[in-house]
Amino acid sequence: MATSMATAADARDPRLSKEAHATQQPTDVQIEQSILHADYGHDPNVSFEEYLYYANWTRDYEKTLSTKGRGMSSLLSVLSGKKQQAVVSGVPEPVTAPSIEARANDTSKKPDDAPTDTFGIISDYEWHHASRAARTATWGAVFYLITTDILGPFSVPWAFTQLGYGPGISLYFVFAAMAGFSGVLLWWQFLGLDSDKYPVKGYGDLGFRIYGNWFRYIINILQSGQFFLGVTLLIVANGQSLSQLSQGPKGSKAFCFTACLIIFTVAGFIVGQIRTMQKFGYIANISVWLNVFVILMTMGIVANSDPNYEAVYASYQIPKGPIKTSAGAPSDLTFIDNINGLMQAVYSYGGATMFCELMAEMRRPWDFWKGLIVADTFIFLCYIVFGLVVYSEQGQFAFNPAYQGINPYAWQTVGNVFGLITGLIAACLYGNIGIKVLYANVGRSVLRLPALESRVGKCVFVATVPVYWGAAFIIAAAVPQISNLSAFVGAAMILQFSYTFPPVLAVGFNCLRDAVGPGEGFDPATGRVVRRDEGLRRWVRGYRKRFLVNSFNVVYFLGAATTAVLGIYASVYSMHRQYAHANIKPFSCDSPTG
């Protein structure tokens, strides 16, 4: 995630002029990358057919690119933190783009709505090279980035305590398969709408180009909420780590839990003042391997020690007793408990939010499916192996996160220290991105603030960081229930990006694309779009072209939406129930780990 966001984080405002480009040699194109993040993708005057036209042109060019040494072998450059050099081999056949005059003479558009045409300043050649320079990632690198962003199996054993062996394995497999299918849907839409001229830079761009601004706003709001509550969850988890660390090997009285949350929050907004993320590259790679070590360590320790009965009783009110496992759903649990366990699977596969950003940096986005399938399979196997090992050894006493449920204090300390390091890095990255998303969608679009790279923008960023972290702390201290809170985040936000939005976007994409009949489409010579009808009739005609596929996606969408509603209800109900019967209270000194 850190790697994929580095370019956006460091982008500066372009200083472009006709004179500068008039003297520039065509072999030395120096266009700053921030121009690729401009609002050309949100121009309401650009039609769906125009996006399709230039996307087909870009895909045809990408077929000519060599793939030698661009697969799994490219992982070495990612692991070492080295940025691959962009290779732009030749220039595709020039396309006659609509001129400013042609757009101005187009009576189908209102003069007041005509956008400022930056393409009149930047030549097609320069635009092509500037766009290609930002695309260097390979499918091997994408496999690594998806894996490191999603891989985090520490809630899987607790999910098995709520589901049992059979339902747990089955549901994790189903959600892995459907997450892969959703990724393929997003990949297909990206190929059809992304181009060097109109690059797709994020999930919201797909929503805008298919359904309009209202859908983009929904996506941006949910993305902002996901990043914010991601920081909140990390504050709770690492507050628990600090609480366990403060107890010492003899189990003495721990620090006040709310104080532990404050300590991590203060550390977070101090480190979070780093505005750019390039410096996080090596640190983020180190944190990945620390995470892998904690996974292996936890599996080894649970096989040779007792569970942490004190922590389990403090959080779940399960008294010490014989270890039990269940082939099916445990008989002493309710449907609400099963749904909360299911939401851990949703949370575990929450990587679709970043798929568009990864494809936007790929040299050949067509190859994305390779990295997706390999990563999805690898992550599923890791989750199942880790979940089965820990659940088989600890049974109903499996804790969330799992490394806090091991009993030897020395190894528990190792897990907590490494967890603090990786958690602080992850929280700072999520906070950094979350603030930038808010600034772009509220500060820039609504309040008309200057660019983040400006002096005012930097001051606003610095002032926003403590407010952002302070708000996350308030929620963390008010709801210190990591399992129920993660279930809520999974149901309300992550499930939408991984399962609800992809099929509904696919239906819209198919309808708009298949509605284009003979003699219709975009004319690059005039900039006009020829359509013989508009409105509902056009959508119905497009839907019928792929009736079975579209109908399946509608059913998939309705199923995902229903699951989201059930998950939100179950998580909120469980929060209320735990407050009524557990020792965990808001803003309390009592720790969920005992």
Identify the function of each model-found stretch.
Residues 157-192, 196-200:
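Extracellular loop-to-transmembrane helix junctions
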Residues 136-154, 263-265, 344-351, 559-563:
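The first (N-terminal) embedded transmembrane alpha-helix
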Residues 274-282, 484-485:
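Membrane-interface helix caps and helix-loop-helix hairpins in membrane proteins
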Residues 227, 283-289:
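Cytoplasmic-side transmembrane-helix entry/capping segments in multi-pass membrane proteins
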Residues 159, 270-274, 474-480:
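Hydrophobic alpha-helical transmembrane segments
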Residues 134, 138, 190-223, 232-260, ...:
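Membrane-interfacial loop- and helix-cap regions that link adjacent transmembrane helices
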Residues 1-133, 140, 144, 199, ...:
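Intrinsically disordered, low-complexity terminal tails enriched in acidic/polar residues
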Residues 128-151, 161, 221-225, 462-463, ...:
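Membrane-interface recognition of transmembrane alpha-helix starts
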